[in-house]
Amino acid sequence: MFDGEDLKKIFAMDGFLRNIEFEVSYISEGSIEIKVPLKENLMRVGDIMNGGAIMAISDAIGGLTVMTYGSVINQVTVNFNTEFIRPIGTGPVIFRSSMVRIGKNIAYVDVAAIDGNGQLCSKSMGTYYIYR
C-alpha cells in the first residue's frame, strides 16, 4: 500500500516538488490530504499563494492519488483544469484529493485547496493515464 513515506520519497525525487514543505494528514485508497505551510517560495506579489504553485501541488497530489491503487505502477497527466475561487493568503493550505473514477487506463481525480481559514480557494480536476 502506498503510504506517507512513499509520498515524501516521490516529492524528494522531483526537482520542483522537493522544495515544497508538507505534512501528510492521511492517505487511503483513492484519497490524500496534505498540509502545506505558506512559505516565501510559494508566494507572489500581493502576499498570496502563486497560482502555478497551487496547480503544481494539486496536480502532484492528484497523480499520487492514482498511485494509491495497488495495481498502478505510475501515471502521467493527460489534462488538468483549475478554477481559482479566492486568493490564498493564510495557511497552512490543505490539499485534499478524491478519486472520481478509475478505469483500466484513465483515472479522474478532484483536488480542493483550502486556506488556513477553512475556505475553499481552488478546485481542480485531473485526468491521468495509468501504467499498470
From Swiss-Prot:
One MF annotation (Gene Ontology) recorded for this entry: fatty acyl-CoA hydrolase activity
Family matches, as InterPro entries: ACOT13, HotDog_dom_sf, PAAI_dom, Thioestr_dom
Taxonomic superkingdom: Archaea
Family from the record: Belongs to the thioesterase PaaI family.
CDD domains recorded: PaaI_thioesterase
Pfam families according to UniProt: 4HBT (PF03061)
Keyword set, alphabetical order: Hydrolase
Enzyme Commission number: 3.1.2.-
Leading EC class: hydrolase
Name this polypeptide is given: Putative esterase Ta0293
Entry annotated with the keyword Aminoacyl-tRNA synthetase: no
